[in-house]
Amino acid sequence: MTLARDAVLWAADHRWLREHLPKYRFVRRSVRRFMPGETLEDAIAAATRLRERGLPTMFTALGENVTDLSDARRVVANYRDAYDRVADAGLDTEFSVKPSHLGLDLDPEAALANLEELATKAAERDNWLWLDMESAD
């Protein structure tokens, strides 16, 4: 692993940094190319601009390691809504999700059911669902 990658992964595991670093303007400007906003509306607006340039996009909801299954269900509901809104906007946008964001660390069977639900939604909308690689300690 590289030093930069190790630093980013270390920072991602620290709540205080996740909550406070985005408040700094230089941090927001540094990540804007990869994360053009904090809402689905921001992402759709950026994807629309990129579509005009012929560029496909990928959406992911930031976060992982939910602390209870109701949080995982909210994640699923948000992705389902995003699939519908992206299809309605006619965007060439695919989605990726982290298994721990669907509750893998809490209940593997519930996480699998959540994953199957999202895969079904992706198929209904003629789209894709990509799984992000996560740490395997």
Report each predicted region and the residues it spans.
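Alpha/beta catalytic barrel-like cores
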Residues: 1-129, 135-137
